[in-house]
Design a protein with these regions (language model features):
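Extended, EK/Q-rich alpha-helical coiled-coil segments that serve as long dimerization/scaffolding arms
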Residues: 1-5, 75, 124-128
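Short coil/loop "hinge" linkers that interrupt or connect long alpha-helical coiled-coils or helical hairpins
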Residues: 48-75, 125
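Extended, charged amphipathic alpha-helical "stalk" segments
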Residues: 13, 25, 31-38, 67, ...
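Mid-chain, well-packed structural core segment of small domains
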Residues: 65-93
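Short, charge-rich amphipathic alpha-helices with coiled-coil/heptad character
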Residues: 1-27
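Long, charged amphipathic alpha-helices with heptad-repeat/coiled-coil character
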Residues: 26-33, 90-107
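Non-transmembrane, heptad-repeat alpha-helical coiled-coil rod segments
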Residues: 96-128
Length: 128
């Protein structure tokens, strides 16, 4: 009986650790997603500002401490590519989050099952 209890305890600890790792991954995913969402909004604002400009307007790009003159068409293309990339990353993060949340639900069920089995073993030992 003691060996079975120890085995259940070990399984429970393993599952709880796995659940905690998944929860950390979910938190990290949310943090990265928040950063990408902010960048997406910033790039959309830049895109709108670039659309307002005349074709002859001077556009400068900040590279380190220096402002470098950039062609308007090139600037628009760069911003569009950046928005596409960020959008793709957001979709990827959403898909990853869905998988993590499903995995989290499965681990929670396993932990609950193991806890119930442990509770069932303990009263039996107390009566004996």
């Amino acid at each position: 009986m003691a060996a079975a209890k120890k085995e259940l305890q070990l399984q429970l600890e393993t599952q709880v650790n796995a659940l905690q790792k998944i929860q950390k991954d979910i938190a990290k995913n949310h943090q990265v997603r928040r950063q990408y969402t902010i960048q997406h909004g910033e790039n959309e604002m830049v895109q709108k500002e670039l659309e307002i400009l005349d074709d002859e307007a001077n556009v400068f790009k900040l590279i380190g401490p220096v402002l470098v003159k950039q062609d308007l068409v090139e600037a628009k293309a760069n911003v569009n590519k950046r928005i596409e990339y960020i959008t793709a990353e957001l979709k990827r993060l959403d898909a990853t989050l869905k998988v993590l949340e499903e995995s989290q639900a499965t681990k929670r069920e396993e932990v609950m099952r193991l806890q119930q089995r442990m509770q069932a073993v303990q009263p039996g030992k107390a009566r004996a």
